[in-house]
């Protein structure tokens, strides 16, 4: 009889633990396969625009020309910039125009390779993170972590910000 009570108590405790875990996870993201596929397609479009050196096409992926598009500066870079501008915040103006111009004018073979891609989406908000290698003439020039924020507006996904590390 004690074995039956112990077994029943175990099942009750296990059920409570599983129910508690499910409740602790919070609400599910409002995500769907179609939006995730469209976001993944944007990544490939971005990559192909670099290969084809189409800076204009990259700017069309952005929500507007003023999006944050910048690498994160090291503390040494920030300290150096603050010698000339005490208010330097570590980011500075967007580098989107400069990147688009680089693509349009470079004679080098360019490519950005992505790996460890993670895409999260909750309704009209998307987040993409990945490791990247920026390749010039078939040699890795620099690598890092890249983070995109996206929003869905008028039925289309657009990039709100792109930030990355460089090493």
Question: In which residue ranges do the predicted regions lie?
Answer:
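Short, solvent-exposed secondary-structure junction/capping segments
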Residues: 48, 60-79
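Short, low-complexity N-terminal intrinsically disordered segments enriched in polar/charged residues
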Residues: 22-61
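Short beta-strand edge/turn micro-motifs at domain boundaries
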Residues: 25, 127, 142-167
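Bacterial N-terminal signal peptides that target proteins for export
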Residues: 1-10
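Surface-exposed, charged secondary-structure patches
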Residues: 82-137
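Bacterial N-terminal signal peptides
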Residues: 9-19
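Sec/Tat-exported extracytoplasmic proteins
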Residues: 43-54, 62-66, 100-103, 107, ...
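A mature extracytoplasmic/lumenal domain signature
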Residues: 62-65, 73-74, 118, 130-134, ...
């Amino acid at each position: 009889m004690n074995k039956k009570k112990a077994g029943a108590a175990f099942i009750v405790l296990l059920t409570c633990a599983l129910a508690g875990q499910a409740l602790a996870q919070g609400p599910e993201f409002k995500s769907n396969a179609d939006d995730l596929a469209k976001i993944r397609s944007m990544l490939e479009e971005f990559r192909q625009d670099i290969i084809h050196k189409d800076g204009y096409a990259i700017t069309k992926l952005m929500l507007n020309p003023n999006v944050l598009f910048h690498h994160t500066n090291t503390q040494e870079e920030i300290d150096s910039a603050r010698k000339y501008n005490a208010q330097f915040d570590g980011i500075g103006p967007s580098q989107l125009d400069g990147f688009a111009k680089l693509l349009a004018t470079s004679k080098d073979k360019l490519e950005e390779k992505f790996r460890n891609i993670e895409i999260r989406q909750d309704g009209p908000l998307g987040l993409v993170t990945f490791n990247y290698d920026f390749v010039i003439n078939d040699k890795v020039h620099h690598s890092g972590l890249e983070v995109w924020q996206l929003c869905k507006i008028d039925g289309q996904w657009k990039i709100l910000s792109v930030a990355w590390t460089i090493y």
